[in-house]
Amino acid sequence: LPTNDRRQRQMCIRDSYIIVGAGSAGCVLANRLSSNALSTVLLIEAGRENNALSIKIPAAVLANLKNKTYNWAYQGEPEPALNGRQIQHDRGKTLGGSSSINGMVFIRGHALDFEGWRQSGCVGWSYADVLPYFKRMESYSHGGDAFRGAEGPLNVYRPNPKEPLAQAFIKSGEQAGYPVTDDICGYRQEGFGSLDRSVHAGERWSTARAYLDPVRDRPNLTVVTKAQVQRLVIEGGTATGVVYKDRRGKITNVHAQREVILSAGAVGSPQLLMLSGIGPAEHLQAMGIDVVADMPGVGQNLNDHPDFVLKYKCTQPVSLWPKTKPLGRVAAGVRWLLTRKGVCASNHFEVVGCVRSGPGVEYPDIQLTMSPVAVDDDTWKPLQEHAFQIHVGLMRAHSRGKIELRSSDPAVPPRIFVNYLQDPRDRVLMRKGIRMVRELVDQAAFKELRGAEIFPGDSAQSDTDLDTHLNSHTTTQWHLSCTARMGPKTDRGAVVDTSGRVHGIAGLRVVDASIMPMVTNGNTNSPTIMIAEKLSDDIRGYTALPRIEADFWQHPDFETSQR
């Protein structure tokens, strides 16, 4: 049946499952839960269909981020440690969510991330527990092995970097004494190597493409777009449904036979919990919201990866700058339209360095990624010269933020306080990362290609100088997470149990990046998909996949050596 007719039919009965948010996690759940023909699934998305051509083009990342049609573009609160600057937090507002507008970087995280989850009280989330689901979700371009999957819905591509700057990046890492890794999602994450991406046959491979598109015709799956959920319906301590406003402004109340599942992301899920009376009682009362469950952890523990960019001139014409000029863009676009190949078929983050900030650090806490074109921080337009940039990302920041309601009106965006560099230890680590980049580009492999440092510039050497630039230019890597974290019920800061069930509320789960206890070491899209895969089995009552006790590399002398 067409979607509208199907919806009218199902309005007469209860849906087995209601999923709020058709993003990176929601699309996975819609696929897996609707595989049982006896269950009906309603997937509600505030955004629209993701059929824009720009979403398919891997190189159009910045264009998609600038397009508010597909981007929530939340404006953060003034950051105290960043001169009061307000950081924009881009989140996908379309089918596929952020997987439809992100940079397509695919990093699972380090094995010890998940050992940390287990040690924090999240039994069943160790590396051995999650590896089977990482494998199940992917179809890796280099085939399956002990670590990688070969038959999953999500196509993951490993590039073979041939551009001079990419090769110089990896070679310089080796010359600086770091290991070279064959697969950052495999046995060894630490080191320099190729950076996987969720791209297939020259097109972005979002969770909408991978999980939702193949099953849109299932008669027991209904997808409603341009519909914003206003609140959850809680009756006698049980979530029984949701209230949403459709594209015409009509308010609709829908009921769930089994469960309501929030997959609205690290911003949207805690916002909806609080709008529904689940959250810190004092804050809810201040917003005029009746308290259903006093849960102080909702919206707290906000994690992100701070980002700082260094820019360098090229001494040879090896950057992508000419391809960004009007004629170059037209030529690249035509080639992509005809062949799905060329410059437009890449996200241009092809290499990465996962490094430790110093002796005693167990596993990488700094991520270095290179782009073969430098852009202006404010306009995101390419610098009009041959240049490249290297991003310093802090993978385990000590600073924590929070999300609070600005209003009891669901249409009003919440307040986002990340508190970047508020903890002095984060500032120390970011300075170390900047100096690592400078050491990297000073190696022989880079010296042939690298000119002067455009930003922050050779004059910025002291801690004070670097802090000045960190204050004015630190930004986000768009990895907001951990705002409804997993943990035992005895932990007052925990919001959900290890099955994603909200403590104290029956029939309600959260399944997305907000339930991470702590952010993973790398881009968060891959672990978010894994979370949805794993919990889809739990929701259906399936036995978890058998654990995989795979070995992983850790520097044998990490206690005394930085590399």
What do the PLM-derived regions correspond to, one by one?
Residues 1-9, 13:
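Single conserved hydrophobic/aromatic residue that forms the stacking wall/gate
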Residues 14, 36-41, 126-127, 219-222, ...:
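Loop/turn elements at helix/coil->beta-strand transitions in domains of secreted/extracellular proteins
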Residues 19, 23-28, 266-267, 515, ...:
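Residue-level detector of alpha-helix initiation sites
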Residues 40, 47-52, 57, 232, ...:
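Glycine-rich loop(s) and the adjacent beta-strand/alpha-helix scaffold that form part
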Residues 118-239, 243-245, 309-333:
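Conserved redox-cofactor binding core of oxidoreductases
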